[in-house]
Swiss-Prot record:
Gene this protein is translated from: gshA
Protein name per its UniProtKB record: Glutamate--cysteine ligase
GO MF, any single term: ATP binding
Keyword entries, A-Z: ATP-binding, Glutathione biosynthesis, Ligase, Nucleotide-binding
The keyword Disulfide bond is assigned to this record: no
Cellular component GO terms, alphabetical: cytosol
GO biological process, one term: glutathione biosynthetic process
Amino acid sequence: MKESILSDLLNRRLSLLGANLDLLKQCLHGIERECLRVTDDGRLAQTPHPEALGSALTNEQITTDYSESLLEFITPALADPAKVLDSLEEIHRFVYTKLGGEYLWSPSMPCALPAEEDIPIAEYGSSNIGKLKHVYRKGLALRYGRTMQCIAGIHYNFSLPEALWPLLRDAEGGEQNDRDYQSSAYIALIRNFRRYSWLLMYLFGASPTLDKGFLRGRPHQLEELDEQTLYLPYATSLRMSDLGYQSNAQAGLTPCYNNLASYTDSLRKAVGTPYPPYVEVGTHKDGEWVQLNTNILQIENEYYSNIRPKRVTYTGERPIQALMSRGVQYVEVRCLDINPFLPVGIDLPEARFLDAFLLFCALEESPQLDNGECGQCTDNFLTVVKEGRRPGLELRRDGQPVALKAWATELIERIGQLAGLLDRAHGGNAHAKALETQQAKVDDPELTPSAQVLARMTEHDETFVQFSLRQSRLHAEAFREQPLPAERQQAYETLARESLAEQSRLEQQEVGDFDLFVGAYQASILAISN
């Protein structure tokens, strides 16, 4: 009975969209790809961020994440995912003209890492905002260790057209204003994402193995594949498993996705609530900043989640402030592994499937999550990342066991309705084909990227590092053989130069003491009231 009621709402919304197909051409997509710079023997590059790539502080397309050696490439948000991937490929091709003898590491799990203290923390110059970004990263090192921060991923940003929400609200007799209805709809999408994201880990998880040194001798439940490689035989994404690391400070922080206000409120409390072990350390050691504050979270982005509600921020504005004042604008999917077989880590069929999947999450009925269902969602996710390919694996739905294969097949069939609409809107059958590709992985687990990684390593008798370096070299060769057209190369050169000039300007115009700047930044969050 429940399924038919839920399908009724989905069917009504599908009919409405079917009459407004043009709206589906206005969804926006953006991709962020992180990757380590490595030496030609597969070790972490300890060179500074190449100046030829511009300023990591002000270049909007090429920056660094945690480490000076961890690059992040950011595409613009565009309506056509094919153009987004073209942009991501262009960035890779440009970067390879500036890397010298270094490589971009192909998988999510890191290369052989140096001693913890030798992993360089990203530098952003002498402006107050640049220093703040550096101190925040020092705080992450203090709290979670540097090693964990070297894991890379793909972030997929997605928004539905703003004109869609009033249509849905009016058809359903809703009374919220445009902004609040839109925010509620995105939070509902996130609840459904929590319910169904285990499917993404099965289909796209690509990290069943890792370098033994990554665990630094910590206790673990992994098995030895060879002397230098740890793995789990049925794992899809060790990157998204706990790997024996727990954040005790964040353990009690489970933002409620029942509405935007409860979500922002829980994060606001966390960035304003001291955590005794951090208080004990303090913010300074030997006169140097070691963390921005001693609270559960230094800033909102420290909260680790698989998906985030987002709003583009104004200069100097904090993410929570933007969400509270203007509502949710898009979602950022953060649980995707980099596929080491793909030059940019993701391809068009994956993007097309993600679009249909996220559209399904947005339009399917999304009841509130109680504590029991919340725990069930987390358990299903963790089960799939550790043993998603185990034959006969069962998950839990409504408290009852259900075979992963049966549930995945049912979900893909339902997502197929959205793929059909997207194909009608865009012409062709690319979305339906993307779904067929994913269903084939459900039917045959050997087709999943995680199984392919293990098969390739076994076939070549390679360690994790050897396999990853071979893939990195293959991709490097492909990029270097395809230089950008001169005008595109020039455009990226200009972007890099302008970003360096912008950083220099910021540093020259800087007024005010850094301690006061941090104090004001901290106070900005405490001053917000609902």
